[in-house]
Amino acid sequence: MSKPWLFTVHGTGQPDPLGPGLPADTARDVLDIYRWQPIGNYPAAAFPMWPSVEKGVAELILQIELKLDADPYADFALAGYSQGAIVVGQVLKHHIINPRGRLHRFLHRLRKVIFWGNPMRQKGFAHTDEWIHQVAASDTMGILEDRLENLEQYGFEVRDYAHDGDMYASIKEDDMHEYEVAIGRIVMSARRFIGGKDSVIAQLIELGQRPIWEGIAMARAIIDALTFFAKSTQGPSWPHLYNRFPAVEFLRRI
């Protein structure tokens, strides 16, 4: 049987598909088992994020088709971190699992899927990365409204590594977190962090002009979001960082 393919997609701010980062570093640890196709032609841009995701989706679809059509005996695996997890999640949900999807013919060849800090995480579906952070609680899910569903019913294995406190991957169904979902929509559509009416800051201010009875939950959500972003400069204490080694072990079990 042919060596399986591993397709990896980096997170925001990591446009070099071969550079350091969770997906690429994980792939380098399993090159004795997998053929590796990192996804380039994808800007991994913070602003605007959704067009960046769409470019990643298009490139991942293209590479899967090229590699799997060329070798009908090869199985494959997917791995994505943060924005890259959105790319993988979009392709998995809408193009592989979907019976009308462009890649549905390859569903039976998909063996493993890995997410780290996944904004599309299915509610209650989380795995530990055996590191310093608590795994996300069973009543949490990803921040995007378009989430993965019913992953347990398919023939491929999934590891969705999610930390408690990772705002992208671990929110609850309550008033405060409804506003965090709104903040997630802002991040997807904003063209810059500050400056102009289409910036994150301008849209957060607009969000803050909701009726007073919504104010407490909204304020808590914004404070939570700003605290989360501020911690991004604090190294391993930021809950959106992950340990890759459980994923390496998972990929090696084929």
From Swiss-Prot:
Hydrolase recorded as keyword: yes
Keywords: Antimicrobial, Bacteriolytic enzyme, Cytolysis, Host cell lysis by virus, Hydrolase, Viral release from host cell
Biological process (GO), any one: defense response to bacterium
Gene3D superfamilies: alpha/beta hydrolase, Lysin B, C-terminal linker domain
Family: Belongs to the L5likevirus endolysin B protein family.
Physiological role: Endolysin that degrades the junction between mycolic acid and peptidoglycans in the host cell wall and participates with the holin protein in the sequential events which lead to the programmed host cell lysis releasing the mature viral particles. Once the holin has permeabilized the host cell membrane, the endolysin can reach the periplasm and break down the mycolic acid-rich outer membrane. Cleaves the ester linkage joining the mycolic acid-rich outer membrane to arabinogalactan, releasing free mycolic acids.
Protein name (record): Endolysin B
Organism: Mycobacterium phage L5
Encoding gene (name): 12
